[in-house]
């Protein structure tokens, strides 16, 4: 098996709109299913070796589909993506607060949906240019050039933007009541406006932010200590972490780690009291 992951710092002109970028190439894998997990960003994927075969979308009512380029909204359940043993493509993380400028619609209109990128951008220029480029730097530059040109001037309400900032900065730990107090809105009004703009309610967003941070921390540890991870991420206990992990991935933390990376060196750690991975 060969794997290549190429991180890229987004162009300064896209600051606040594109929060991350990655090129990836994996070959020699056994055919299987990749889980597209919830995160605090919309996901833009351009494939370079065929199409993306989505067997199940976050909204299970959406029919399976194949995409040359896909845009996924914020969600709380995993997408299931079949692959034939190889995966090559470019992935961008888009801030939900930048959706109006980049896509012409609020991220709330894309909640739990996967859509063909061409349907949102109004054409295939981004996909065509990325696929024509011969190197990772050229591919990133091509995608960013198109996004810089299509970016408009729409912005979310300042109160929603501040609520999102507080959710990220607090790692999902701030209560909705406290966020509402800080932005000067009632909880009910904040929840409605926040969901319309991002696709998630404030409580859901906090859960996703907390999970995303825990996922990154777990992926970086060859010998995971789930109890310590739960405490650091703001979960009540290890059992709480495991429940949330199952809700977002369909697997326990250690089973997810084994499925994603092929091995787990857990030194006897268990997913939750009385429950092996």
What do the predicted segments below correspond to?
Residues 1-187, 197-202, 216-221, 225-236, ...:
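Alpha-helical bundle regulatory/interaction domains
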Residues 194, 206, 244-246, 257:
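DNA major-groove recognition helix of helix-turn-helix
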């Amino acid at each position: 098996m060969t794997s290549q992951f190429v991180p890229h710092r987004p162009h300064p002109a896209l600051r606040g709109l594109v929060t991350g970028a990655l090129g990836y190439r994996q070959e020699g894998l056994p055919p299987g299913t990749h889980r597209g997990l919830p995160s605090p960003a919309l996901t833009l994927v351009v494939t370079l070796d065929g199409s993306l075969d989505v067997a199940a979308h976050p909204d299970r009512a959406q029919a399976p589909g194949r995409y040359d380029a896909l845009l996924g909204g914020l969600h709380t359940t995993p997408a299931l993506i079949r692959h034939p043993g190889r995966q090559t493509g470019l992935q961008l993380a888009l801030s939900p607060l930048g959706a109006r400028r980049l896509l012409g619609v609020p991220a709330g209109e894309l909640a739990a949906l996967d859509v063909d990128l061409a349907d949102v951008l109004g054409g295939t220029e981004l996909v065509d240019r990325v696929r024509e480029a011969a190197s990772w730097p050229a591919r990133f530059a091509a995608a960013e050039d198109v996004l810089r040109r299509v970016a408009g001037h729409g912005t979310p309400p300042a109160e929603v933007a501040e609520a999102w900032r507080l959710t990220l900065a607090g790692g999902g730990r701030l209560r909705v009541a406290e966020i509402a107090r800080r932005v000067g809105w009632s909880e009910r009004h904040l929840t409605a406006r926040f969901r319309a703009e991002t696709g998630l309610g404030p409580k859901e967003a906090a859960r996703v932010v907390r999970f995303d941070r825990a996922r990154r921390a777990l992926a970086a540890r060859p010998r995971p200590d789930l109890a310590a991870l739960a405490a650091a991420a703001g979960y009540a206990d290890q059992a709480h972490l495991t429940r949330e992990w199952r809700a977002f991935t369909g697997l326990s933390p250690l089973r997810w780690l084994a499925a994603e990376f092929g091995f787990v060196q857990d030194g006897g750690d268990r997913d939750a009291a009385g429950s092996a991975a």
